[in-house]
Amino acid sequence: MVKYISILGSTGSIGTSALDVVSAHPEHFKIVGLTANYNIELLEQQIKMFQPRIVSVATKDLADTLRMHISANTKITYGTDGLIAVATHPDSNLVLSSVVGVSGLLPTIEALKAKKDIAIANKETLVAAGHIVTELAKQNGCRLIPVDSEHSAIFQCLNGENNKEIDKLIVTASGGAFRDKTREEMKTLQAKDALKHPNWLMGAKLTIDSATLMNKGFEVMEARWLFDIPYEKINVMIHKESIIHSLVEFIDGSVMAQLGAPDMRMPIQYAFHYPTRLPSSYEKLNLLEIGSLHFEKPDLEKFPCLQYAYECGKIGGTTPAVLNAANEIANALFLKNEIAFFDIEKTIYKTVEAHHNVKDPSLDAILEADQWARQYANQLLIKKS
């Protein structure tokens, strides 16, 4: 069966990898819609190659510029309404949500209402509104298929298994760019240092989140919703080689793991063609060449953001959305070299501490908490500077 796919975030790291997968298997995958933020040069190339029915960009000006360069066969939209139009296009049956940040939340929700299966790479959607998204998926008979390598690994390990027989999920982490640095050494490190990820090629925001281990915290929160497992049963393990993507330990002591080369095209292809597999020409894993694998506990004193994520996830309500929003603000300013690395964790902590949590929040309450946290975090950092 041919999958008709819309990609939210087609010019980012996940989006371009996804289009590589589509190019490799044109008999199985067709592109219906694409969205970009500001990179219309790359989007224009993608439009010419994949001939989508609809695309969306960030602003009306960018949409007008794009119209001058492409044929009238592709509808061009913009803004949040444009994202939603792509996500809900009637010709698609699978939506890859790979935009960065909480901007992926509304289009994902609308896609579920339109009964689309979701290949989910946008962590923040489940972090901020996991209870809403998972319930909508159930109500509409939609599948949430994970794309992150860690969640794809768990998803594959649990195929055919009974959730009641799970003892724990073990999410692996490379440790990020600063894994071998001391707290003292990290004080003066800048964005250019954090962007040198040891194993994966990722977007800038995600690479900074990896350096703070906030990314791993988000993945723990995501796993809680994807697999309906309490936080007490989700562990993190540092695995520097990024060969074992995650593990599941069962109540009888058996441990199942999924291994593969660190190439995002593999979990993307698995998600796109689920429930069956396709052959690929990507690098195959050779354990004899690797020789040995290493594991250690994460240092929560060195990387407190991981602990914050656990705590906020357990609190629930609007607190996870606040955690995410404060992180987005601080991350963006660190990327501009306007704040120090440790200001990220300080901003997150202070913003979460100041928040008045709303239990079992509506979507509106989550969005209000998100906006409040952005304003509060910005004010904290303005005062600091």
From Swiss-Prot:
Binding site for Mn(2+): D148, E150, E219
Lineage: superkingdom: Bacteria
Enzyme Commission designation: 1.1.1.267
Residue numbers binding 1-deoxy-D-xylulose 5-phosphate: K123, S149, E150, S174, H197, S210, N215, K216, E219
Residues where NADPH binds: T11, G12, S13, I14, N39, N122, E124, G203
Originating species: Bacillus cereus (strain ZK / E33L)
GN (gene name): dxr1
UniProt pathway annotation: Isoprenoid biosynthesis; isopentenyl diphosphate biosynthesis via DXP pathway; isopentenyl diphosphate from 1-deoxy-D-xylulose 5-phosphate: step 1/6
Upper taxonomic lineage: Bacteria, Bacillati, Bacillota, Bacilli, Bacillales
Keywords attached to this entry: Isoprene biosynthesis, Manganese, Metal-binding, NADP, Oxidoreductase
Cited Gene3D superfamilies: 1.10.1740.10, NAD(P)-binding Rossmann-like Domain
Purpose of the protein: Catalyzes the NADPH-dependent rearrangement and reduction of 1-deoxy-D-xylulose-5-phosphate (DXP) to 2-C-methyl-D-erythritol 4-phosphate (MEP).
Top EC category: oxidoreductase
Protein name: 1-deoxy-D-xylulose 5-phosphate reductoisomerase 1
Reactions listed under catalytic activity: 2-C-methyl-D-erythritol 4-phosphate + NADP(+) = 1-deoxy-D-xylulose 5-phosphate + NADPH + H(+)
Manganese in keyword set: yes
Homology family: Belongs to the DXR family.
Cofactor(s) listed in the protein's UniProt record: Mg(2+); Mn(2+)
Single GO molecular function: manganese ion binding
Biological process, per Gene Ontology: isopentenyl diphosphate biosynthetic process, methylerythritol 4-phosphate pathway involved in terpenoid biosynthetic process
